[in-house]
């Protein structure tokens, strides 16, 4: 699948109001590069294990030591969730905790009832608790194909052909 097709699918799913989009990939940076293109003026926030609750664009923490549960608590009303895209990374280990699953389900239900928001889970490990299964749409991001790899290698060689090699 080419990036254009993946991106087009992601846009369609967001526009259609799919509450939770689970992007199964090892390439978090590739997903990050697409988000600004598809956010349609919505505020984008991220939660990850390392930095907590952060502004997606600047990658600066919005709160010190903000746990996933605390972030979810802050978005539990429609007016606080509206016009947002929430990116969750490093949360698969939390998806066996009933309190977390319940809060994620609450977000999904609000989105299903018309709140203009999307939850995007980015992970290389597919973990979907039964309680939120019906709200989740899985989107696979394929790896580079042979032609894409050749293009990257040619570009690298072209860019570096005239540079001196330091042999020390």
Language-model regions, residue ranges each:
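ATP/nucleotide-binding catalytic cores
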Residues: 1-168
């Amino acid at each position: 699948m080419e990036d254009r097709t993946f991106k087009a699918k992601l846009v369609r799913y967001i526009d259609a109001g799919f509450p939770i989009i689970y992007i199964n990939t090892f390439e978090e940076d590739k997903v990050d590069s697409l988000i600004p293109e598809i956010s349609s003026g919505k505020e984008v926030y991220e939660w990850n294990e390392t930095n907590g609750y952060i502004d997606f664009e600047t990658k600066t923490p919005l709160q010190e030591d903000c746990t996933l549960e605390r972030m979810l608590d802050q978005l539990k009303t429609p007016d606080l969730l509206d016009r947002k895209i929430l990116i969750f990374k490093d949360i698969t280990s939390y998806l066996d905790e009933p309190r977390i699953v319940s809060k994620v389900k609450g977000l999904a239900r609000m989105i299903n009832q018309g709140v203009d928001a999307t939850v995007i889970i980015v992970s290389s490990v597919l973990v979907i608790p039964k309680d939120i299964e019906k709200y989740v749409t899985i989107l696979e991001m394929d790896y580079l194909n042979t032609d894409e790899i050749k293009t990257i290698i040619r570009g690298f060689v072209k860019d570096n052909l005239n540079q001196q090699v330091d042999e020390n």
